[in-house]
């Protein structure tokens, strides 16, 4: 299991576009129903900082996520948007869960 946490801050005017791009990723993931991918995204109280939490069964699942058309669109538009704070990626170790 690979757990990845990514956090970044968009410009305020891009936040709603980013939310829609994230919704498109979720919709595509629901349509393929891959058992090895659990994807969540959160908007922090400032309204422009996003945190993504990806639970990936293996590297193949990670590649599936990154190959989605919706993910590619999200990634391209995010980098083109002139972020306030660039993404910080951390690989987490699960200690406990319910």
Q: What kind of feature is each model-predicted range?
A:
Residues 2-9, 37-68:
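Short, well-ordered beta-strand segments in beta-rich or mixed alpha/beta enzyme
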Residues 8, 37-48, 75-98:
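Glycine-rich beta-strand-turn "strand-cap" elements at beta-sheet edges
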Residues 9-20:
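Short, surface-exposed ligand-recognition loops at beta-strand->loop->(often short) alpha-helix junctions
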Residues 14, 50, 71-74:
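Phenylalanine-focused residue identity feature
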Residues 14-16, 60-62, 97:
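Residue-level signal for secondary-structure boundary sites
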Residues 15-16, 26-30, 41-43:
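Intrinsically disordered, low-complexity segments enriched in polar/charged residues with Gly/Pro
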Residues 24, 28-37, 55-89:
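An amphipathic, aromatic/His-enriched active-site/gating alpha helix that lines ligand/cofactor pockets
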């Amino acid at each position: 299991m690979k757990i990845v946490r990514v956090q970044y801050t968009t410009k305020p005017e891009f936040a709603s576009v980013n939310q829609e791009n994230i919704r498109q990723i979720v919709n595509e993931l629901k349509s393929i129903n891959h058992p090895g991918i659990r994807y969540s995204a959160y908007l922090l109280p400032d309204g422009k900082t996003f945190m993504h939490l990806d639970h990936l069964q293996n590297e193949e699942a990670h590649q599936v996520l990154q190959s989605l058309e919706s993910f590619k669109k999200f990634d391209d538009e995010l980098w083109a948007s002139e972020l306030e704070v660039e993404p910080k990626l951390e690989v987490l170790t699960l200690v406990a869960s319910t």
